[in-house]
């Protein structure tokens, strides 16, 4: 049985590349076949045995507040600085409310629930869910030494080799994410828009390695722009439904 019962969802982003679709709502509320990304994700988490979900909010946060009123397992922590900071600050802003193993997720994901079980059952306390190449645009590429994180970047030229792509679901131990918080604190003045994935790379070393669990044909997508949404509707969702 998994010892992880908490999930953190990073949901503060503006979603500006989706233009009119996210002017008045967060991108987690985009719908696929009548259900929002966020509510589908919450359902997957609850089914996986997660009983506490903390959502880091920002843009149009009232939508998440309304969602939390329907789920006793959900609480929200709002970041007043969401417009000028990155995903790592959204996570850092929750630091006083977290001290247990957790799953860290992005809010704009459409994914098969098997990925959650893969992480929850993985023997490493710190493990990133990864996939094979998606060719979706805006990928975060991962370099490993076989099964441990070495580097991550959206720029292929910054990596020695590309072994996988970041899905946006990670299992983290308190020790690792508190190291990420400390790194965020030390770099905030110069890098306020720090992404959480860069903080993971910064704290991953020989003494604190982060595993990478790759599922080659894993059905998932992040929805950051119109092309991602069309891929979700035409390719990813049919694969999830039929599996």
Indicate residue ranges for each PLM-predicted region.
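Glycine-rich N-terminal loop/short-helix segment of MobA-like nucleotidyltransferase
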Residues: 2-32
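Conserved N-terminal catalytic core of the sugar/cofactor nucleotidyltransferase
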Residues: 1-9, 35-101, 190
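A structural signal for short hydrophobic beta-strand segments in well-ordered beta-sheet cores
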Residues: 29, 142-144, 212
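Short beta-strand-to-loop acidic/aromatic patch adjacent to the donor-nucleotide binding site
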Residues: 100-110
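Conserved beta-strand segments of alpha/beta enzyme cores
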Residues: 28, 73-75, 209-211
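Conserved alpha/beta core of the MobA/IspD/sugar-nucleotide pyrophosphorylase nucleotidyltransferase superfamily
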Residues: 2-7, 165-243
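Short beta->alpha linker loops
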Residues: 33, 59, 82, 195, ...
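Conserved core of the sugar-phosphate nucleotidyltransferase
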Residues: 112-189
């Amino acid at each position: 049985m998994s010892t992880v019962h908490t999930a953190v969802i990073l949901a503060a982003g503006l979603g500006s590349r989706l233009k009119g679709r996210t002017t008045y709502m967060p991108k987690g509320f985009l719908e696929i076949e009548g259900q929002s990304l966020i509510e589908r994700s919450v359902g997957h988490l609850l089914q996986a045995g997660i009983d506490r979900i903390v959502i880091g909010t920002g843009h149009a946060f009232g939508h998440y507040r309304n969602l939390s009123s329907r789920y006793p397992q959900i609480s929200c922590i709002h970041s007043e600085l969401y417009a000028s900071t990155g995903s790592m600050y959204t996570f850092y802003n929750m630091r006083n409310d977290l001290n247990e193993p957790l799953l860290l997720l992005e809010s704009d994901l459409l994914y098969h629930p098997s990925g959650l079980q893969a992480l929850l059952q993985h023997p490493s306390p710190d493990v990133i869910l990864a996939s094979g190449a998606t060719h979706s645009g805006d990928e975060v590429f991962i370099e490993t030494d076989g099964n441990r994180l070495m580097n991550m970047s959206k720029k292929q030229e910054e990596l020695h080799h590309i072994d996988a792509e970041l899905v946006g679901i990670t299992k983290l131990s308190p020790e690792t994410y508190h190291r990420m918080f400390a790194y965020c604190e030390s770099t905030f003045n110069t890098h306020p828009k720090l992404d959480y994935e860069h903080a993971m790379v910064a704290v991953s070393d020989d003494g604190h390695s982060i595993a990478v669990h790759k599922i080659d044909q894993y059905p998932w997508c992040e929805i950051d722009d119109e092309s991602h949404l069309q891929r979700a509707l035409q390719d990813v969702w049919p694969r999830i439904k039929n599996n």
